[in-house]
């Protein structure tokens, strides 16, 4: 029973780390990366469709993305969706392909992005600590129900704390790497 609680806590903590990593990946660095446009929705024949379902996103060079639209009639809808996104990008049309030059980040903008990334990391840490709290309270419920001993509770609390420390360390490593990436000129 306690093993299931610990296993579940470890899985949930892993998911928290993955979610934090995905949130941080959305923060724009100076480099072009196809995942930068993952959050963009295109109005395609009256329905909102993810950009990656109506176009192929690729990297042309370190500062330029290329978007090849599958259906030529949707080029303007894709262009409009990219321009109206909060990424501050201006696509240039070249036939069935849109070229998106990424403007260089200013020092002030980089610092803003670092604040956003640190906030995401803190949210990830909080989520992991919430998982720890839930796991420990589940184990204590078992103790109250006389399903395990006090020693088992203490041992499992220590193990859950080790999982927590390891996962928070992973988030800190991801944060440090992202900060370095953001400060590169």
Curated annotation (Swiss-Prot):
Disulfide bonds: none
Location of this chain's protein in the cell: Cytoplasm
Top-level division of the source organism's lineage: Bacteria
SUPFAM superfamilies, alphabetized: Ribosome recycling factor, RRF
Membrane-spanning parts: none
Pfam families xref list: RRF
InterPro entries tied to this protein: Ribosome_recyc_fac, Ribosome_recyc_fac_dom, RRF_sf
GO molecular function: ribosomal large subunit binding
Main localization, broad class: cytoplasm
Gene Ontology cellular-component annotations: cytosol
Keyword entries, A-Z: Cytoplasm, Protein biosynthesis
GO biological process: cytoplasmic translational termination
Described function: Responsible for the release of ribosomes from messenger RNA at the termination of protein biosynthesis. May increase the efficiency of translation by recycling ribosomes from one round of translation to another.
Family as reported in the entry's similarity comment: Belongs to the RRF family.
Protein name in the entry: Ribosome-recycling factor
Species classification: Bacteria, Pseudomonadati, Pseudomonadota, Gammaproteobacteria, Alteromonadales
Name of the coding gene: frr
């Amino acid at each position: 029973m306690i093993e299931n609680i610990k296993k579940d806590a470890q899985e949930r903590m892993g998911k928290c780390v993955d979610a934090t990593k995905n949130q941080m990946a959305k923060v724009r660095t100076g480099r072009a990366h196809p995942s930068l446009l993952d959050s963009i929705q295109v109005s395609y024949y009256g329905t909102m469709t993810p950009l990656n379902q109506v176009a192929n996103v690729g990297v042309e060079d370190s500062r330029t993305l290329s978007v090849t639209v599958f259906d030529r009639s949707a080029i303007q809808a894709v262009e409009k969706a990219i321009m109206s996104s909060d990424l501050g990008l201006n696509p240039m049309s070249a036939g069935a392909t849109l070229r998106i030059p990424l403007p260089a980040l200013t020092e002030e903008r980089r610092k803003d992005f670092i604040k956003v990334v640190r906030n995401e990391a803190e949210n990830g840490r909080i989520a992991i600590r919430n998982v720890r709290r839930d796991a420990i309270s589940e184990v204590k419920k078992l103790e109250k129900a006389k399903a395990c001993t006090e020693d088992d509770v203490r041992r499992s609390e220590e193990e859950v704390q080790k999982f927590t420390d390891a996962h928070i360390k992973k988030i800190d490593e991801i944060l440090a790497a992202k900060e370095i990436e953001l400060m590169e000129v």
